[in-house]
Amino acid sequence: MSMSTSTELFAHHWAFAVFLLGAFGLCALMLLGAFFLGGRAKARAKHVPYESGIDSVGSARLRMSAKFYLVAMFFVIFDVEALFLYAWSVSIKESGWLGFIEASIFILVLLAGLFYLVRIGALNWTPSRSSRQVSKPSVVININNSHPQ
């Protein structure tokens, strides 16, 4: 690399180098500031959970319902699909018929996967194996206050 090439390289990329230096410097400054200025607890109960001044009850690890993961999967699937289709729609003139065919194949593969997941029941909000069957009561309870005469 000659001197003029390295000078040109520096001239073109100096702003990025300053940005990286500033970002790493700011991270280091915040970490060091928290280390030196932050308080330290030296009590025995340092690692005990604190619940509004009372002793904690039960475990802090709660089991999340699978419905939350299902919503997250829907979001990721349709977000990525929308991202690719948006990029395709922006460049539709440049891609021509070949791009249209590729986007159609992409959509068909996604639809095939979606229909497969619906068919096997992977996207059911309440799967049939976990839904409770409510039976009718065998005894009818009279709750009105009329007395027999």
Curated annotation (Swiss-Prot):
Kindly list the residue ranges recorded as spanning the membrane: 16-36, 68-88, 98-118
Catalytic activity reads: a quinone + NADH + 5 H(+)(in) = a quinol + NAD(+) + 4 H(+)(out)
Cited Gene3D superfamilies: NADH:ubiquinone/plastoquinone oxidoreductase, chain 3
Enzyme Commission designation: 7.1.1.-
- GO molecular function of the protein, one example? quinone binding
Topology relative to the membrane:
Multi-pass membrane protein
UniProt cross-references to InterPro entries, sorted A to Z? NAD(P)H_OxRDtase_bac/plastid (IPR023043), NADH_UbQ/plastoQ_OxRdtase_su3 (IPR000440), NDAH_ubi_oxred_su3_sf (IPR038430)
Which family is this protein grouped under? Belongs to the complex I subunit 3 family.
Q: What is the recorded name of this protein?
A: NADH-quinone oxidoreductase subunit A
Species source reads Photorhabdus laumondii subsp. laumondii (strain DSM 15139 / CIP 105565 / TT01)
Encoding gene (name): nuoA
